[in-house]
Amino acid sequence: MDTVADIAINWLENTNIDGFRHDATKHIPDEFWKTITRRAKAKVNPSRQQNIFQIGESFGSYEFIKSYVNNGMLDSQFNFELFFTLRRIFVEKESDFADLKMALEKSLSIYGYNNLMGNIMDSHDQVRMMAYLDGDLDFSDNGTERA
């Protein structure tokens, strides 16, 4: 754990990157996220005009996603619940903007106005939105993709 954290700190110090996008965060022990965040805040943040930003990617409930945010682990997570709402509206045509309003309000009530969540239209873990919108793929009656 310390070796990987050392490597991450080295990248932050020597490349001037602003942060990290972490994949599959739920498959890595919580202690790692706490370690890397604690060390970045102690060693890298003081020498910069801005804080290091870390966003994670995990699928799960609102409560599960929130468990990673601003508790010493990550600054943000991708908001897949909002992504699925957008897909229901624009691709599946099973929802409307009233549902989008409710999803945004729920997201704000759970994550808070002070957390910058990763609201996305696309993900490498899902079929790309444009594959549906430009007609390359259609959603079948049961919600599976077909060419």
Where are these regions (language model features)?
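Active-site mouth loops of central-metabolism enzymes
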Residues: 1-3
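Active-site-proximal helices and loops of the catalytic beta/alpha 8
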Residues: 7-9, 13-120, 134-137, 141-146
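Active-site neighborhood of divalent metal-dependent phosphoester/pyrophosphate hydrolases
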Residues: 128
